[in-house]
A protein has these predicted regions:
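Short coil/turn segments at secondary-structure boundaries
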Residues: 95, 428-431, 479
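Short secondary-structure capping/turn micro-motifs that flank functional sites
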Residues: 99, 434-435, 511-512
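Short, conserved active-site loops that position catalytic residues or coordinate cofactors/metal ions
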Residues: 59-60, 93-94, 98
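Structured non-transmembrane domains adjacent to transmembrane bundles in polytopic membrane proteins
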Residues: 72-93, 102-210, 442-640, 770
Length: 771
């Protein structure tokens, strides 16, 4: 039995008997194990070969239509479903806006713009990778038998612009062809090309839902190539700096790429069969999560493997010990992230629900690859570490000792500094982080307009600006009200007086709502009519959202409404999305905290240590959010943020940020069992400092790569998570957590004090601390 000192730590000394379970394989067992390792590698090559092409096809199963993200119970969704009874053509309109260079349109310009509408259906469209030839008419909604749908030219009142609403068929332009692409972007390009030819000295823009979705698709087109290239290149560079080896960085990176192939293949199959919702944001986050997590897990395993190679000659024994030592912290880390991501299933937004399983699949793939493929590849031998090949160290100071070099390394110095000043360090750190938290209320996360979605100039936003300048702000995006025919006049009267509504709301007739519909009877379907009201402000503006809320309040208050009046439209979709995001924030965050706390208690077998890590991580998250608010408002000059930004940042920072504290405290618990609560934590920090810092830098770099996609949401997530991970790595895990744990002593590990296991007693041999 090992002897214990007065503080409960195991005293130096060699374990009574060495366990023989880790002996190097020989003879028949060696052959079987070699075959098994080769089999693992072959299986992963097959996975990479099958899953790799699926990564490039993920864009073909994306859905970036905001309405599809909302729950079926949202009023705007119910209104949209009801409106299909009045027009089942399934339009995805494109707004073609012609405008002059500042003066009134000349007769020649008006004639050219009018000719554009007449020849529009015959304009050629080159679609697909094979350049198949079609026409715009192939993608218009179907008109009455023998007749085409009219596409009129609508001049502006100021005479400086004209609007053409092109009724594209949503089913036709979004249908995925054999090459995995839809035709929307090509059709919009055809509309723009023909418009440029007909501008007659003016300018043309393509806006509306079709133009916006096409521009979103173009922005996310960089995910498959540019984002992966930037992320993988940055990670490879960091791995070279960390390992200073020729082959090892490629081994770790290949593991990450294989994990991505596995995750991409699974997500593609599930999205293709409508099991989950995938959008451009989820795809980008999937790539970053897999590359970052798989590399982090690989760093931890390789670090422990290298440590064991300084203790034993056999690479099999070294990888077996390293695998066993890393299994628990990596499993806890992956489990924490997966649980946090799956909490998104509680969201009422389908886009958030989709990200939950998408991200969980990515983390699970990273976990499996890091603990199967990477160990098999590492069995190639010590030469992978060339030119810094680890050698077995001399015995110094007993079986559990850690050797120190003549010149202490950086993390040895930091650990000594922390153990000498624990209370002062954690108090000062908490105060500094609390000051940063004070700026959280300044984060403007109440939503942004669609014109603020892009970080670069895009044509659909320029078109929306031109539309707002020359036409009523909500032109082309009316508020849609579905009401019983009997109370329709009362609803019209109630809505007409609302601030933010332009003109008199119109009841839809069989001839439409324009001048041609004057005197026509209303179109009645199942006892209901459709009313359209034009907003005076841009449909995606805060003023328009306020007007929609007022319309809902007024329409629902009409006698006889009784829940039968529905208010929808594009602006209503934005309102419902914002409201649902705020609700998700209040529901999901507490659930994530409780789930993470339970995982930590089970892992560390200590309520106090688990509470310490959760509290430190929440404080770190608040600090990151506060600093981000300052940067967004005063440096980057962002217009605001989506309500989902704080939620996603919380999920990633709490689930991923706590990883480093998990890695630290699991090793600290092992050391505390031998050296007590002070020296044990100090040694845990010294041994893990280099690898955890490298892992933090890798994860921060991969998330920062999201900024190459010119979308406001992704840029904000990139900054918050990258900064938060670095803050957690260099401040929380380095100073706050170890200082507080040392200051509380054995109480940190209440109620179950750490005790060494038989494997730990048998395996502890000296290892040099440092990179």
């Amino acid at each position: 039995m090992p002897k214990h000192g007065r503080d409960g730590a195991t005293e130096p000394g060699v374990a009574g008997r060495a366990l023989d379970q880790d002996r190097a394989p020989s003879g028949r067992n060696a052959v079987l194990r070699a075959v098994g390792l080769v089999g693992v590698v072959v299986v992963w090559f097959v996975i990479a070969g099958l899953g790799g092409p699926a990564i490039g096809s993920l864009s073909s199963v994306q859905s970036n239509d905001q309405e599809t993200f909302l729950p079926a119970g949202a009023e705007s969704v119910a209104a949209s479903e009801a409106a299909r009874a009045f027009d089942d053509s399934g339009q995805l309109p494109a707004f073609v806006i012609f405008e002059t260079d500042g003066g009134t349109a000349s007769p020649d310009q008006l004639a050219a713009w009018g000719a554009y509408t007449e020849s529009l259906a015959a304009q050629p469209v080159l679609t697909g990778r094979d350049g198949s030839l079609g026409t715009v008419g192939d993608y218009l909604v179907d008109g009455p038998p023998g007749r085409s749908v009219p596409v009129p030219l609508i001049p502006s009142e100021d005479g400086q612009a004209a609007l053409v609403i092109v009724p594209l068929s949503e089913d036709k332009v979004t249908a995925v062809a054999a090459d995995g692409q839809d035709a929307l972007g090509d059709v919009v390009d055809a509309l723009r090309t023909a418009g440029d030819a007909a501008a007659a000295g003016g300018s043309v823009h393509i806006a509306g839902p079709a133009g916006l979705i096409a521009d979103l698709g173009a922005a996310f087109a960089g995910i498959d190539g540019l984002l992966l290239l930037v992320a993988l290149s940055a990670v490879l560079l960091i791995l070279f700096l960390v390992y200073r080896a020729v082959a090892l960085p490629f081994v770790v990176l290949f593991t990450s790429i294989s994990a991505l192939a596995m995750a991409g293949g699974i997500v593609y199959l599930l999205a293709k069969n409508d099991v989950l919702t995938l959008n451009g944001q989820s795809q980008g986050i999937l790539f970053i999560l897999v590359v970052g997590a798989a590399t982090d897990y690989g760093l931890l395993l390789v670090s422990r493997y290298r440590e064991e190679l300084t203790r034993v000659e056999s690479t099999w024994t070294a990888i077996t010990r390293a695998w066993r030592a890393c299994l628990e912290p990596i499993a806890a880390s992956a489990g924490t992230v997966i649980i946090g991501l799956l909490c998104l299933l509680l969201s009422d937004l389908n886009s958030n629900k989709g990200l939950g399983p998408v991200g969980a699949i990515g983390i699970a793939s990273s976990f499996v690859a890091a603990l199967t493929l990477l160990p098999a590849l590492l069995m190639a031998g010590r030469w992978l570490f060339w030119p810094r090949i680890p050698r077995v160290a001399e015995h110094l100071g007993g079986a559990h000792a850690i050797t120190h070099r003549a010149r202490p390394g950086l993390w040895e110095k930091i650990s000594v500094f922390v153990v000498r000043n624990p209370r002062k360090i954690w108090v000062v750190t908490v105060i500094a982080l609390a000051v940063a938290c004070a700026f959280v209320p300044t984060l403007k996360a109440s939503g942004t307009s669609q014109t603020d979605v892009f970080l670069t100039d895009v044509d659909s936003i320029a078109g929306q600006d031109a539309l707002s300048e020359h036409f009523p702000g909500g032109s082309g995006n009316p508020v849609v009200i579905i009401a019983p025919e009997a109370i329709a006049p009362d609803v019209v009267a109630a809505v007409a007086g609302i601030d933010g509504i332009s003109g008199e709301p119109a009841v839809v007739t069989a001839a439409g709502t324009g001048p041609q519909a004057a005197g026509a009877p209303p179109l009645v379907v199942d006892g209901r009519v459709q009313i359209q009201a034009t907003l005076s402000a841009a449909a995606d503006s805060e003023g328009a959202e306020d007007a929609v809320r007022a319309v809902r309040a007024a329409a629902h208050a009409v006698p006889g409404a009784d829940g039968r009046v529905l208010v929808g439209g594009n602006t209503a979709v934005l309102v419902d999305t914002t409201d649902t995001s705020v609700r998700d924030l209040k529901v999901i965050i507490p659930v994530v905290l409780v789930a993470v706390l339970i995982v930590l208690i089970l892992l560390l077998r200590s309520l106090i240590a688990a509470l310490l890590l959760v509290a430190a991580t929440v404080l770190s998250f608040g600090s990151a959010l506060g600093v981000s608010a300052l940067m967004f408002n005063h440096v980057f000059d962002f217009p605001g943020a989506d309500p989902a930004v704080p939620l996603f940042a919380f999920i990633f920072l709490v689930a991923l940020g706590i990883d480093y504290s998990i890695f630290l405290m699991t090793r600290a618990r092992e050391e505390v069992a031998f050296h007590g609560p002070h020296d044990g934590v100090m040694r845990g920090l010294a041994v893990t400092g280099g690898v955890i810092t490298s892992a933090g830098i890798v994860l921060a770099t991969t998330f920062a790569a999201l900024a190459v996609i010119p979308i406001l949401f992704l840029a904000q997530i990139a900054f918050i998570v990258a900064f938060g991970v670095l803050l957690d790595t260099f401040v929380v895990r380095t100073l706050l957590v170890p200082a507080a744990a040392i200051d509380m002593g054995w109480f940190t590990w209440w109620p179950i004090r750490p005790r060494p296991t038989k494997h730990q007693l048998a395996q502890r041999r000296p290892v040099s601390v440092g990179p």
